[in-house]
């Protein structure tokens, strides 16, 4: 606020009361910092302290001696494969969410606000239902004697039940369902913020609807898409419940390995190392995505 | 007015007396026992723990444990709030090796009637469960599978199968499927076992990870035959699903009790455990917890059971002869290595 005010004043006015303005700014900064202290303390207590403890644990083996054993273990094929399949599943779910979610968010953003708000309820509705319930519902729908297979058989479209669940297919269907709102909501709000004037201007300049979408709308919605995709991808990386229930034990997600290390093998050191690895990789991916989205946004804007 | 005051004074006096009486009873000693929770813990308390606590003159307080890790945290704290823990036998064996438990006093606890594999220096099995072969009778109408060899015979018995994500019992089952005789299982030939599992893997539709899930798979006909806990398949049959199972070639596993190191009630805990494994209290299992079994075979000498109860109990002399006991000590020493190979095999 003060800087804006300073900009509005004549150039020499700033010099006259610079000391006063500076003091004002410092006081305001202090006040802002003071206001955020409770939040900082909370984050430190519930996030940083436990995580530091977790990271600390990961350097000790089961007998309590200092060792890199827990990290060396991560290079074994079982863990490497699990890590790769976690990335694959997360990427697939994110891609499907984008394909399904982008048109929906686009449609919502083009509708009158009141209609869009009603339709948004349908997207938010699943949020109010427990993930466990939704996952079991998929089990009922997708299993061999489930609703979908029974219908398809009665319609004579298939003679043998399709393997829709207890495998990768079922896992991805279930995860997409849970993740879709996380993609659509940030995307929708960023699309709403795009001023329709830009698109009209593009049309006035002779751009076809496809051109104005590609050259104007898409780059402007890229930050929202990036945020939604990053959120979806990162949530997928740590997803436990749905893969565990719909994967039939055949989709080895990283989170399953962490749960196993704690619950089946009581090895907190190993579980900690797995968690630290997941966190580091998540951080790297988030950073890379942020960078990529910025590049994408600017290159599309130029092209 | 004074009459009313008198009445109140009387009431207070009676209440105080009552309070004192109940605190005097509790003063005996309170043992805190931590188990798996849920129905199993409820049944165990009613069947085994409460009568044993009454006999030992202690009050019982219950908690739930979350695997050996939670026990480790309790012991490492120096003053555990649990005295006794109910775990799976391999967890007891691992905990014993790690020094988490007090040694059991076998002068107090009598092991007559116990299989040698069913107790160790620091733990004793208190109830058994069976992992059995179960199948859908609507799928296998004329000829049903009768052994793990049939489970591996996908030509004679086509159909979708399920095994557990836990290597325990499954490694044994694979060896039985390979034709290894049940008295020659241990030490497990892990190489052969994993080979057999790899061979059957394309026909395993689901690797289940919880008892509830395993029951649902069979009930909803998601799979046609599977390895499943006896107690779970029993509930599926009770629900009217066309399912049968056999104790033939079943694997017997244990739940066990151990005393946490640092407990301040060790002597009372020893007495309590002695009660739990006594033939008289063990004899309550066949009727109160069908499909589970007593670990003390003398229970069948002490108790009189109807043929129906005996047919259901996994430990009745007739049924126990068909099955084989898990070796908790082998799993204690090999768990982690086998587990990694096993999960590698499942997920690749």
Where would I find each of the regions flagged by the language model?
Chain B
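Periplasmic-binding protein-like
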Residues: 129-131, 191-200, 237-263, 304-308
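Mature extracytoplasmic/periplasmic domains
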Residues: 260-320
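Ligand-binding "clamshell"
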Residues: 95-103, 115-121, 235-247, 308-311
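A bilobed periplasmic-binding-protein/Venus flytrap-type ligand-binding module shared by bacterial periplasmic
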Residues: 132-139, 175-180, 254-266, 273, ...
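Early extracytoplasmic/lumenal segment of secretory-pathway proteins
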Residues: 27-94
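Extracytoplasmic ligand-binding site segments that recognize negatively charged/polar headgroups
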Residues: 36-45, 80-82, 86-219
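A ligand-binding cleft/hinge motif common to bilobed small-molecule-binding domains
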Residues: 90-96, 219, 224-242
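Conserved C-terminal helix/tail region of periplasmic/extracytoplasmic solute-binding proteins
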Residues: 318-348
């Amino acid at each position: 606020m003060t800087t804006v005010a300073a900009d509005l004043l004549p150039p020499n006015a700033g010099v006259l009361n610079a000391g006063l303005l500076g003091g004002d700014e410092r006081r305001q900064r202090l006040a802002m910092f003071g206001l955020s202290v409770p939040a900082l303390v909370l984050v430190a207590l519930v996030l940083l302290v436990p995580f530091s403890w977790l990271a600390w644990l990961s350097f000790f083996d089961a007998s309590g001696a200092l060792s890199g054993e827990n990290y060396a273990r991560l290079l074994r094929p079982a863990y490497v494969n699990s890590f790769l399949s976690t990335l694959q599943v997360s990427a697939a779910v994110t891609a499907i969410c984008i394909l399904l979610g982008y048109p929906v968010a686009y449609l919502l953003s083009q509708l009158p606000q009141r209609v869009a708000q009603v339709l948004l309820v349908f997207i938010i509705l699943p949020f109010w239902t427990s993930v466990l319930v939704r996952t079991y519902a998929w089990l009922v729908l997708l299993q061999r004697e489930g609703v979908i297979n029974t219908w398809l058989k009665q319609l004579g479209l298939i003679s043998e039940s399709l393997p829709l669940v207890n495998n990768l297919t079922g896992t991805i269907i279930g995860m997409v369902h849970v993740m879709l709102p996380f993609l659509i909501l940030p995307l929708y709000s960023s699309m709403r913020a795009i001023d329709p004037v830009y698109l009209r201007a593009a049309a006035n300049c002779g751009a076809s609807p496809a051109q104005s979408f590609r050259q104007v709308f898409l780059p402007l919605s890229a930050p929202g898409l990036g945020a939604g995709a990053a959120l979806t991808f990162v949530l997928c990386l740590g997803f436990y419940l749905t893969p565990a229930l719909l994967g039939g034990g055949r989709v080895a997600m990283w989170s399953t390995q962490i749960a196993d290390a704690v619950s089946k093998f009581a090895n907190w050191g190993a579980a900690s190392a797995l968690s630290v690895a997941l966190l580091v990789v998540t951080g790297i991916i988030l950073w890379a995505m942020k960078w990529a989205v910025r590049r994408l946004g600017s290159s599309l804007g130029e092209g | 007015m004074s009459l009313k005051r008198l009445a109140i004074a009387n009431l207070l006096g009676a209440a105080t007396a009552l309070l004192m009486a109940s605190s005097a009873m509790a003063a005996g000693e309170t043992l805190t026992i931590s188990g798996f929770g849920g129905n199993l813990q409820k049944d165990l308390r009613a069947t085994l723990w409460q009568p044993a606590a009454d006999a030992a003159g202690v009050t019982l307080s219950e908690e739930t444990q979350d695997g050996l890790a939670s026990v480790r945290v309790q012991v490492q704290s120096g003053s555990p709030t649990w005295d006794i823990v109910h775990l799976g036998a391999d967890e007891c064996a691992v905990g014993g090796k790690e020094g988490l438990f007090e040694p059991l006093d076998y002068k107090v606890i009598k092991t007559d009637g116990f299989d040698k594999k069913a107790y160790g220096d620091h733990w004793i099995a208190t109830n058994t469960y069976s992992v059995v072969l179960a199948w859908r009778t609507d799928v296998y109408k004329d000829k049903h599978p009768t052994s793990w060899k049939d489970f591996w015979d996908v030509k004679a018995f086509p159909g979708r199968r399920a095994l557990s994500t836990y290597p325990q019992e499954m490694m044994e089952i694979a060896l039985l499927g390979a034709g290894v005789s049940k008295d020659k299982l241990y030490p497990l030939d892990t190489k052969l076992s994993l080979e057999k599992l790899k061979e059957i893997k394309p026909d395993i539709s689901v690797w289940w990870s919880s008892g509830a899930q395993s029951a649902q798979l069979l009930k909803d006909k998601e799979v046609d035959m599977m390895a499943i806990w006896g107690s779970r398949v029993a509930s599926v049959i009770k629900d009217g699903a066309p399912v049968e199972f056999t104790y033939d070639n079943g694997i017997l596993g244990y739940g066990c009790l151990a005393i946490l190191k640092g407990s301040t009630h060790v002597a009372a805990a020893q007495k309590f455990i002695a009660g739990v494994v006594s033939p008289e209290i063990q004899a309550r299992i066949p009727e109160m917890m069908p499909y589970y079994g007593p670990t003390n075979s003398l229970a069948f000498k002490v108790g009189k059971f109807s043929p129906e109860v005996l047919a259901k109990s996994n430990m009745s002399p007739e049924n126990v002869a068909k099955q084989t006991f898990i070796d908790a000590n082998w799993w204690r020493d090999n768990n982690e290595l086998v587990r990694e190979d096993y999960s590698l095999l499942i997920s690749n």
